[in-house]
Amino acid sequence: MADKVQTTLLFLAVGEFSVGILGNAFIGLVNCMDWVKKRKIASIDLILTSLAISRICLLCVILLDCFILVLYPDVYATGKEMRIIDFFWTLTNHLSIWFATCLSIYYFFKIGNFFHPLFLWMKWRIDRVISWILLGCVVLSVFISLPATENLNADFRFCVKAKRKTNLTWSCRVNKTQHASTKLFLNLATLLPFCVCLMSFFLLILSLRRHIRRMQLSATGCRDPSTEAHVRALKAVISFLLLFIAYYLSFLIATSSYFMPETELAVIFGESIALIYPSSHSFILILGNNKLRHASLKVIWKVMSILKGRKFQQHKQI
């Protein structure tokens, strides 16, 4: 029964992976083509491209871990290969979260309407420093990933190996204090960007409220470009926050799996939930970006035209 559930979850993970690769690859391809055409890249496109690349890597690492867990479980008993996978999973996980946080910060400074001198100074400087901020996210993610991977790897692999040798439901003997401190470190590391996104979300709501009040006093109406920009930014940020909560819970399931009777099943269940976040959020970003939305509509129109042409030719031959 457990094998059937694992196989079903693996097929589900493959479907989520395919959808996520399609959406994120589309974002990266459109922005890179525009970069080559104009020989420069806008800050928002740089953030979206970096986010798409990190999520493609994250999707690949998670799916690879799912395949190894179901098809080649004995690999978990070795240290070198799984340590590499754990490192890249932790690295791409933090990169995708921090890049999404950078996107929320960028929306706040470019769309928010505040008149504080510090805010205006940051609003003017954000395009100049965004590349350095992204580079800082990479350095920070590497700094977080190295020690965390070593501790989690040692605890989890020992547990899986012990279970396979003794065939008992509970035979893991690990340093729970060390494991708890490692989990706490990882959770706090992801809590910081979540709080920053949450702060950006509430400040954007405050900015939208002030803008609508100002439009009502001037009797110009509320449906202006600035209001629409606020709404699109809020949709992108709130979708990230909700999906991040689901991803965070799945991450807790995966990292705490050896406290459960079916360790492998718990891991792949958590990973199948985790794939929802990098897969679905890309399409929300596409719908919220004018250039990406128009490009996606063109692709859909061309695909439909090709399909209609083939149907017409088949009907004509008949």
Curated annotation (Swiss-Prot):
Gene name of the record: TAS2R7
Residue ranges of coiled coil: none
Residue ranges annotated as Cytoplasmic topological domain: 31-55, 116-128, 209-235, 288-318
Lineage per the UniProt record: Eukaryota, Metazoa, Chordata, Craniata, Vertebrata
Alphabetical list of Pfam families matching this protein: TAS2R (PF05296)
Further remarks about this protein from its record: Several bitter taste receptors are expressed in a single taste receptor cell.
Chief location category: membrane
GO cellular component annotations of the record: membrane; plasma membrane
Protein family membership: Belongs to the G-protein coupled receptor T2R family.
Function: Gustducin-coupled receptor implicated in the perception of bitter compounds in the oral cavity and the gastrointestinal tract. Signals through PLCB2 and the calcium-regulated cation channel TRPM5.
Keywords noted in UniProt: G-protein coupled receptor, Glycoprotein, Membrane, Receptor, Sensory transduction, Taste, Transducer, Transmembrane, Transmembrane helix
Protein name: Taste receptor type 2 member 7
Membrane topology: Multi-pass membrane protein
